[in-house]
Every structure is written in structure tokens, then in C-alpha cells.
Amino acid sequence: MAADKIDTIVSLSKRRGFVFPCSEIYGGQKAAWDYGPLGVELKENIKRQWWRYMVTSREDVVGIDSSVILATEVWVASGHVATFSDPLTECTSCHKRYRADHLEEAYEAKHNRSPENGLADINCPNCGNKGQFTEPKQFSGLLSTHLGPTQDSGSVAYLRPETAQGIFTNFAQVQQTSRRKPPFGIAQMGKSFRNEITPGNFIFRTREFEQMEMEFFVKPGEDEKWQEFWMQERWNWYTGLGLREENMRWYDHPAEKLSHYSKRTADIEYRFQFGGNEWGELEGVANRTDYDLSAHAKASGQDLSYFDQEAGERWTPYVIEPAAGVGRAMLAFLLDAYVEDEAPNAKGKMEKRTVLRLDPRLSPVKVAVLPLSRNPELSPKAKGLATALRQHWNIEFDDAGAIGRRYRRQDEIGTPFCVTVDFDTLDDNAVTVRERDSMKQERVSLDQIEGYLAARLIGC
């Protein structure tokens, strides 16, 4: 993977309407992004596939949608108010601020060893001066706000840094109303917020982001088995949607870097190839033990244990948590799908072609309907076909420009099929279907086109 591929994806994303800089007419908001028409579709397709795989295709997982702003007591009990912080350091030469642990991790990735003298051995990524960092101080990752007409200590509230706590506080109600018993899971997708010191790398690290999380409640003693199970399931989900295994790996957090609630955390890392860092976290699968349920039970005075009727005993479930970010998944799928090859133009000359070889289930547009020209007979027929196909899939109608250029536009946004309505259509009532990756073309009767596409767009 080329080192400048991220820049290529950023350019493509803006040019084709996947992702735009936030508030760009005012100069932009740092590390904040808006998702355009194609980006919204890609995001929704990723979320839809996650929900199908993790929830609706299983009998042991149910869903929930909890509030973004929870009671302040939730974050006190969970340990976030006391411990959700990062080590902040500043370069005394250029006054750029960094997370100290990120500087050390980048050093380790480059030199295959830890800096012997800590920050004193590290050059500033901005100005290049060595060892000019201040002593790290803890910086809270919580974003706070005030509720109500007054702004005092009693009105402080927090925007959730994770969706998980809304699941834990609803555990007993969901378990009872859904009539589930461990092992079972509760899943949630939604926005979370973290006051990142050094956001960046496009949509990889932002202060506002969307999560896909599931908390799987199991009997203590069975947690390690279930963590291995969900690690394999999450790996399979990514590879099943097209990520290549050579661009993925597992990273087990060392004991000294585990979160305050974790017994073990393993990350799926992807070869993002950011400047200085080849690998980046794609998704984490954590064993949170009974930390959260026990903490909330103690703080609230409510019983969050489970009575096992078969065993005749009561216990507090352990929790296995696969937690993914929609933005990071989207970036990985875009990077993995991006290909440059060659294809003949109208004159038979080979030209460079850019293709997003996205799995059709993720492709923002499933089918493009293209009349050969803006002919008064062809256009109405093509528009009628597009209207009929929209009952099933997201369809794009395009009649502007040469047909070869329109094919290239669709290749670049990942559309798996182009359907061309030409002058022969008026006689034989058939259309030409072009497949994105192979560029092979096939003639299909109009009365069979829906079935033809449906057989190739299963799961879309």
C-alpha cells in the first residue's frame, strides 16, 4: 500500500462527495468532518451490515438506543470522571501539544524498541527538536456541558465517551423484558464524544464519532472462551466484507496499558500507513469482567446480578465487548478497495482507471442506469427503468457526457453494475449490464433485469 494512499482517499472523498471538511466556508473545524451523499450511504451500509451480523441474524443479541447525555452519576460510578484521561505534553520549542503515549508508540513503531529515556529521546514531529517536551500532565477526555438555566457545579453533564454505559445501566430491564439469559448480548450504535488532545488522520481520530458496540454478558469462568469466540467473529466480519487479511493483525494490550476495567483487550489493527505509524486500531474486543455492573450496582443500590435457576446461584455477569468505530471501518474499507488499473478508452487506447472494489453490500450506489445519449426515445425508457429499480436499491441515473466517462465515474465511487439503455433496446427490449471489476458486459432482457441484479446483489 502506497504511503500517500491516505491523501489519495481524502482527495477522492471530497471530490466525489464521500466526506467534506466541517464548516469549510468558515475555514473549517479541526478534525471534524461532514459526510456527503455517498459517505452517508457508505456509512449506513456499514452500520446495516454490522447490525445484521451482530443482532438480527442471532437469537442471543438484542438492541438498544440509549441517551447521549446520561446522569452524571453514571460517569462517576464507571470511573470515567476519575480515570478517563490522557498524558498531555507540550514541545517547548514550537508549543505543539501531543499525547505522550502516542509519541512513545510512534517511536517504538519506528525503532522497534521503547525510548530508553522516555520523551527525552524523541524528536518533535512538528519542529524536529529532540527532547524538548514538558512533563506530561493528565488531561480529561470527557466533554462536558451544562443542563438547565444555570451554569454551576450542579448543572454539569457529560457527552458520553462510549455507548457502553447506557447498555450497563439498562442491563436488568433489557434482560427481563427481552426474557434473555446469559450468555446474551445487548448492542447499540450511536454518537460518542472524546476531548482528544491530538485528533487527526482524516476520519480516523475525531472528537465526535460513531460507535458500533455490543456487550455480551456471560457466566464468570466462561469469559475467556467467549472473548476468543467474539474475536474470531469480528475478524470474520471484516474479511467477509472484503478486507484483506494481509492488511490486518491482532494486537494484545500489555498489562500496563489496559483500561481500568479490562482483564484483557485485543485490537484488530489495520495497515492504515499513517505518517510514522503503519498500523492503527480498527476495533477492540475487551474483557470488561464484572467491573461495570458491579460498579453501577454499588453506586445506585440496585441489584444488577443474575440468578441462575439451573445452578441455583446468583452471580454478576462478566462482559465481553466488541467495540468498533464507523469512521475507522469506513476508512479501512475505502483504503482496501482503492485500486488503479488500466482499461481501454473509446479508441482502444489503454488509460488509467480508478476503481473502488467495494463489496456490493457496502457500495453507496448499487446500480447506475445510463442512457447511451440524451435521446428523446432513450432517456424516458432509461428513467422508467431507474424508477423501477429504485424500489429495491439505491440507483443513480446519469446521462451527462460520453458513456466511457460515465463508466469511469461509477467505477471511482464503487458502483458494482452499470445498466446501459441503447438504441438496440428500442428493438430488442434488452439492456447492456457492465460489471465493475471485470468490465465484462452482458445483454439482459428488460423483463429479467430485476431478477438478474437481485441474484448478484444478495444482502444489499
UniProtKB/Swiss-Prot annotation:
Which biological process, per GO, is one annotated for this protein?
A: glycyl-tRNA aminoacylation
The answer to keyword Hydrolase applying to this record is no
Gene Ontology molecular function, alphabetical: ATP binding; glycine-tRNA ligase activity; protein dimerization activity
Q: Which GO terms describe its cellular component?
A: cytoplasm
Q: Where does ATP bind?
A: 194-196, 204-209, 281-282, 325-328
- Predominantly, its location class is cytoplasm
Catalysed reactions, semicolon-separated:
tRNA(Gly) + glycine + ATP = glycyl-tRNA(Gly) + AMP + diphosphate
* Matching Pfam families: HGTP_anticodon (PF03129), tRNA-synt_2b (PF00587)
Q: For binding substrate, which residues are annotated in this chain's numbering?
A: R99, E162, F209, E210, Q211, M212, E213, E321, P322, A323, A324, G325
Compartments, record wording: Cytoplasm
Q: What general EC class does the enzyme of this chain belong to?
A: ligase
Q: Which family does it belong to?
A: Belongs to the class-II aminoacyl-tRNA synthetase family.
What role does it play?
Answer: Catalyzes the attachment of glycine to tRNA(Gly).
This protein is called what? Glycine--tRNA ligase
Native species of this protein?
Answer: Streptomyces avermitilis (strain ATCC 31267 / DSM 46492 / JCM 5070 / NBRC 14893 / NCIMB 12804 / NRRL 8165 / MA-4680)
Instruction: Identify the taxonomic lineage of the organism of origin.
Output: Bacteria, Bacillati, Actinomycetota, Actinomycetes, Kitasatosporales
